[in-house]
């Protein structure tokens, strides 16, 4: 009561904001005569003047009134369109990083030019994001004329474009494109191997059109790039033949006294690893030459043969460490992993690093190619990375809380330019679907008879086509519009306002194109204007005739009541229903809307079916009669609010899971960018190498252990096999009784540095540094992809922890952190091992080794929203994604450990 009284006295926050913006509108209007007096050249020169003022210390807010006045004048000169005062307010709302809710037909496309122009002046780029390629192309072409007139460049980012075209589009001052394409480009930019391959140049300011569709409906559906690595089926099969030909060494690892029978490889059960002996290296090379996998005289550790080493070790591990009916079972022609702790089958899980395929080759079952997720991100996390984010839509107010809670975006409802006079009728509720459809057909027939255009909204393509069949039976001409986007869609929608035209559309189809009463005349006018064979005087005469004919048709439609909207079912979200209603009543036009429902509709069944059915039976309502009361409409809207709240809770919970992986991706992508931008990463490689040798040493010689507990023989063998460091450790220990563990460690690290320096001395230093960087990038990418799969598996089952009285979110956070620690350790070990063992003999070999791996069958997915929501409700988990600001070296690590970033997950670099 008190809050209501205060609102009456001072107005709502929305009212107060509109009043504040109106002060600037008065300033812009005052500048109009002065700006209108400028020549075209002087008006264009304003852009350079604004940029100079910015360089001299002015802010964008200082420039706003004059910049908006300049854009308004450019709109008048280029398109004959003058921004209304309410459109100026919309532009200010966008500039302030808020959401502008503007009714359909209020000119949102034109509003975007104001904020886009102002924010493009600093030269950091502006992205204007729409829901499909058609709208992006249309808006870039139309609004690009205004920007071009003022000396700014416009780009259009479409899915079919090549790499060079995309770079050009992003280099423009203002870039139009679809949400999918901007997201995929971001992911692709984080998969490149050279900075020059990137297309985006930073995420500065985005204006999102249809912001509710993109930031709410699609916010939880990840964009996924997946692909198959090269098919190595033949290699797995051949290595499966090689493995049994190599002999396992019996007895100790390399202590000559404890070796019972020398062999080609040793098995370290403690480390779950297989290591080739010196004899094994030679024998393996001979066998590989014999079967044609290795050229005569080539070494196993040359750059071009690294893949052979990887597959050979996978085959040896499959034969020596993994046993049928203990570690796995063969079921229905597939290798299924057995959980070592519970003994349960883990269907769907696969070992990484080619091990699973090696086991499949061993068992003679079909070798399945790995289809990996290469990268993924949700729109929610992508858009939160922009320095400033703004949006426009006709229906945001119902979701204002979510926009504010998730994105920190405030929604401002912009007043209409003319009062809205559309009449929204109460819902009509029938007992059966048959009665409902009969009433819908009767209403449509009545409108056609009176010459009133009708737009019928359906919730699915199936219903769309069912109603089309009923209209065909009733011999009522109509046009069908499905959500499958095609270029003729805009043309169908544009003519949906002609007298007696019936259009059936799925609720989301055709957004972005206005339904003008009497039909859209702009296309025929443009055709006449562009016809060079017609003299100028005749052109004007034809255009005048077209406009006069349109005026008569327009008045005829207004007399019939304007556009009539029929909804055939309530959607789960009030916002979607409001979008359908909002197609009518644009710019103060008359119009009407009504929803026809039945107790057999899904939403009615869930929330109100039984109660209303009982009322209808009690009132003995005859067939074909409907309940029509405001109470029923309010009851349905209350049910919709409950569903919206449930969906919001799901999205919010999924975000909490997302943020865990989000922080990890932030670290990985930052490491990747630092690698790309650093020419010489030798210091990083050195720190990693020394760290890995230290960790290996402590595996065999634990801290604070006595000499009897040392496994010097195992350490000697591991150094020789994994790092080609052949050091007489046993002899050192025997010859020098006072040699302590720290002294041994120092000698090992010094020997590693010496061996590495000798390797670099053989080749050009710059080429070697490039090779180091590519090895690092490839390892990081490979293990990050495996990590994404591991997180996905973890997430799928984490909700079961609740049955053990554990908090699933906390468990997920803890285990995801452990997986990430393992990822970083694995990258360090792999890179160090490869660089220590690779044998470079010529510059050509180095160039060959630098080439990044090719991914085959790369696919781009964006999951269906309803599928994703259903899956989310079942598992309360989602695909991890990346976002957030850059982490400084001395900032707290985002993993939550409490350490500085450089001492925690930043230690990789």
Curated annotation (Swiss-Prot):
It is found in: Cell inner membrane; Cytoplasm. GO terms for cellular component: cell envelope Sec protein transport complex; cytosol; plasma membrane. It is a peripheral membrane protein. InterPro entries: Helicase_ATP-bd (IPR014001), Helicase_C-like (IPR001650), P-loop_NTPase (IPR027417), SEC_C_motif (IPR004027), SecA (IPR000185), SecA_CS (IPR020937), SecA_DEAD (IPR011115), SecA_motor_DEAD (IPR014018). Keywords: ATP-binding, Cell inner membrane, Cell membrane, Cytoplasm, Membrane, Metal-binding, Nucleotide-binding, Protein transport, Translocase, Translocation, Transport, Zinc. It is an enzyme of class 7 (translocase). Part of the Sec protein translocase complex. Interacts with the SecYEG preprotein conducting channel. Has a central role in coupling the hydrolysis of ATP to the transfer of proteins into and across the cell membrane, serving both as a receptor for the preprotein-SecB complex and as an ATP-driven molecular motor driving the stepwise translocation of polypeptide chains across the membrane. NCBIfam families: PRK12904.1, secA. Belongs to the SecA family. This is Protein translocase subunit SecA. It comes from Azoarcus sp. (strain BH72).
């Amino acid at each position: 009561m008190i809050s209501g009284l205060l609102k009456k006295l001072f107005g709502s926050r929305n009212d107060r904001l509109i009043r504040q913006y109106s002060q600037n509108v008065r300033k812009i209007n005052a500048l109009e005569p002065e700006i209108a007096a400028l020549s075209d050249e002087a008006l264009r020169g304003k852009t350079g003047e604004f940029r100079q003022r910015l360089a001299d210390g002015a802010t964008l807010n200082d420039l706003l009134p004059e910049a908006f006045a300049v854009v308004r004048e450019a709109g008048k000169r280029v398109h004959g369109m003058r921004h209304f005062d309410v459109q100026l307010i919309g532009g200010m709302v966008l500039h302030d990083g808020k959401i502008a809710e503007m009714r359909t037909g209020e000119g949102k496309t034109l509003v975007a030019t104001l904020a886009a122009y102002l924010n493009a002046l600093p030269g950091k780029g502006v992205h204007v994001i729409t829901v499909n390629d058609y709208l992006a192309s249309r808006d870039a072409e139309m609004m690009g004329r205004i920007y071009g007139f003022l000396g700014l460049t416009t780009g259009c980012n479409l899915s079919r474009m090549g790499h060079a075209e995309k770079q050009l589009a992003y280099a423009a001052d203002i870039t139009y494109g679809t949400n999918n394409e901007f997201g995929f480009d971001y992911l692709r930019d984080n998969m490149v191997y050279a900075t020059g391959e990137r297309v985006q140049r930073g995420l500065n300011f985005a204006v999102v059109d249809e912001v509710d569709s993109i930031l709410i409906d699609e916010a939880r559906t990840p964009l996924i790039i997946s692909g198959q690595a090269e098919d190595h089926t033949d290699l797995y099969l051949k290595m499966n033949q090689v493995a049994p030909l190599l002999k396992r060494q019996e007895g100790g690892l390399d202590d000559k006294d404890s070796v019972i029978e020398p062999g080609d490889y040793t098995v370290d059960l403690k480390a779950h690893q297989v290591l080739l002996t010196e004899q094994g290296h030679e024998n393996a090379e001979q066998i590989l030459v014999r079967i044609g996998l290795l050229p005569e005289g080539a070494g196993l550790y040359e750059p071009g043969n690294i893949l052979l080493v990887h597959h050979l070790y996978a085959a040896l591990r499959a034969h020596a460490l993994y046993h049928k009916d203990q570690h796995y079972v063969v079921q229905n022609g597939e290798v299924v992993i057995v959980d070592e702790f519970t003994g349960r089958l883990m269907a769907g899980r696969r070992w990484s690093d080619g091990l699973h395929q090696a086991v499949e080759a061993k068992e003679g079952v079909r070798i399945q190619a790995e289809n990996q997720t290469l990268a993924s991100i949700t729109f929610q996390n992508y858009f939160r990375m922009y320095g400033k984010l703004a949006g426009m839509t006709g229906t945001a107010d119902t979701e204002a809380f979510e926009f504010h809670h998730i994105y920190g975006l405030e929604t401002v409802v912009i007043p209409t330019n003319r009062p809205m006079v559309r009449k929204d009728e109460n819902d009509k509720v029938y007992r059966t679907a048959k009665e409902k459809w009969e009433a819908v057909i009767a209403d449509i027939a009545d409108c056609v008879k009176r010459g009133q255009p009708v737009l019928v909204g359906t919730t699915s393509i199936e219903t769309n086509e069912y109603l089309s069949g009923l209209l065909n039976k009733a011999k009522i001409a109509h046009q069908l519009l499905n959500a499958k986007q095609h270029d003729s869609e805009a043309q169908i929608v544009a003519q949906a306002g002609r007298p007696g035209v019936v259009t059936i559309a799925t609720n989301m189809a055709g957004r972005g194109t206005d339904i003008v009463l009497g039909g859209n005349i702009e296309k025929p006018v443009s055709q006449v204007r562009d016809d060079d064979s017609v003299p100028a005087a005749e052109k004007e005469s034809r255009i005048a005739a077209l406009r006069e004919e349109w005026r008569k048709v327009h008045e005829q439609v207004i007399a019939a009541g304007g556009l009539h909207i029929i909804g055939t079912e309530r959607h789960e979200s009030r916002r979607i229903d409001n979008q359908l209603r909002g197609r009518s009543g644009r710019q103060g036009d008359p119009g009407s809307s009504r929803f026809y429902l039945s107790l057999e509709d899904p939403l009615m069944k869930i929330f109100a079916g039984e109660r209303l059915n009982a009322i209808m039976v009690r009132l003995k309502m005859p067939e074909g009669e409907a309940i029509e009361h405001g109470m029923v409409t309010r009851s349905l809207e209350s049910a919709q609010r409950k569903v919206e709240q449930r969906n919001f809770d799901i999205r919010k919970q999924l975000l909490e899971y997302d943020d865990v992986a989000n922080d990890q991706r932030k670290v990985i992508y930052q490491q990747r960018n630092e690698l790309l931008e650093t020419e010489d990463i030798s210091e990083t490689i050195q720190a990693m190498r020394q760290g890995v040798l230290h960790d290996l040493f402590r595996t065999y010689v634990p801290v604070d252990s006595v000499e009897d507990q040392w496994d010097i023989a195992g350490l000697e063998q591991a150094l020789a096999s994994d790092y080609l460091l052949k050091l007489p450790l046993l002899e050192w220990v025997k010859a020098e009784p006072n040699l302590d563990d720290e002294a041994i460690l120092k000698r090992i690290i010094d020997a590693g540095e010496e061996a590495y320096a000798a390797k670099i001395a053989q080749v050009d230093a710059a080429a070697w540094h490039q090779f180091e960087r590519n090895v690092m990038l490839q390892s990081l990418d490979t293990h990050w992809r495996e990590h994404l799969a591991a997180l996905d598996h973890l997430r799928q089952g984490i909700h079961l922890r609740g049955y053990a009285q554990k908090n699933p979110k906390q468990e997920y956070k803890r285990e995801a952190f452990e997986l990430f620690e393992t990822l970083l350790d694995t990258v360090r070990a792999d890179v160090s091992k490869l660089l220590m063992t690779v044998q470079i003999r010529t510059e050509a070999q180095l160039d060959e080794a630098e080439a990044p791996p090719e991914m085959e069958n790369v696919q781009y997915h964006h999951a269906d929203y309803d599928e994703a929501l259903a899956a989310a409700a079942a598992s309360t988990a989602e695909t991890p994604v990346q976002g957030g600001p850059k982490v400084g070296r001395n900032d707290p690590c985002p993993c939550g450990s409490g350490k500085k970033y450089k001492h925690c997950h930043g230690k990789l670099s």
